Structure formats: structure tokens, C-alpha cells
């Protein structure tokens, strides 16, 4: 069975999904990125299934190599953008924890509301 055209098409689909994920990450559309992840995983599984059935010829491998390199490059860029986002979220969580600690330590002052005053004397 010659599945070369189907395999090539599957790789093209994976490239498109990879480019979409990179665009979403670049635009910081995190919810959409996460939603698109399953389609990407399914496309990878489809390619794995096709290559298990019949190994691609050397010629086909040479044709697919540029697509693979593009996908790997996109994946690396997406991972970098995700790491930046995770660092931002970790910083926000840290700030939130500090605020919670401060409120817990100083918030209950025997029913008195602590507020700065313009004139102390």
C-alpha cells in the first residue's frame, strides 16, 4: 500500500497546526492555545500510525525533513513563550501570597481600620 500522499498531507496538516499554535502563543491567546493542543496531539498520533504501517522511503523522508525542522523550530519557540508565561504567573502567585500574608498579619487589628492620615500632628 502506498500511503505516501496521505503521509505527506498529514505532515502538512501538522505544520499548519504547529504554526497556529505558535501564532496563538505569540499573541498570548493562552486559552485558545490550550484548546488547539489536542488537535496537534491527534495529528502527531496520525503520523505515527501512518509510519508504523509503512516506513516512508528515503525520498519521502527527504521531502518531509523541512517540515519536521519547521515543526521542531515552532515547538521550541512555543515552549520559550510558555516558559515566559509560567514565570509571569509564578510572579503573580508569589505577589498574591505576600498580599495574603500581609492581610492576614495586619488585617485584623481589633476592629480598627488602619488608614493613612494626612496630618499626624
Curated annotation (Swiss-Prot):
Record GO biological process: bacterial-type flagellum organization; negative regulation of bacterial-type flagellum assembly; protein folding
Subcellular location as annotated: Cytoplasm, Cytosol
Chief place where the protein resides: cytoplasm
Superkingdom, taxonomy of origin: Bacteria
Gene Ontology CC terms, in alphabetical order: cytosol
Record has Repressor as a keyword: yes
Region (Required for homodimerization) location: 1-50
Region spans: FliD binding: 60-98
Transmembrane segments: none
Keyword terms: Bacterial flagellum biogenesis, Chaperone, Cytoplasm, Repressor, Transcription, Transcription regulation
NCBIfam families: PRK10548.1
Subunit structure: Homodimer. Interacts with FliD and FlhC.
Family: Belongs to the FliT family.
Function, in words: Dual-function protein that regulates the transcription of class 2 flagellar operons and that also acts as an export chaperone for the filament-capping protein FliD. As a transcriptional regulator, acts as an anti-FlhDC factor; it directly binds FlhC, thus inhibiting the binding of the FlhC/FlhD complex to class 2 promoters, resulting in decreased expression of class 2 flagellar operons. As a chaperone, effects FliD transition to the membrane by preventing its premature polymerization, and by directing it to the export apparatus.
Protein name: Flagellar protein FliT
Lineage, uppermost ranks: Bacteria, Pseudomonadati, Pseudomonadota, Gammaproteobacteria, Enterobacterales
The gene coding this protein: fliT
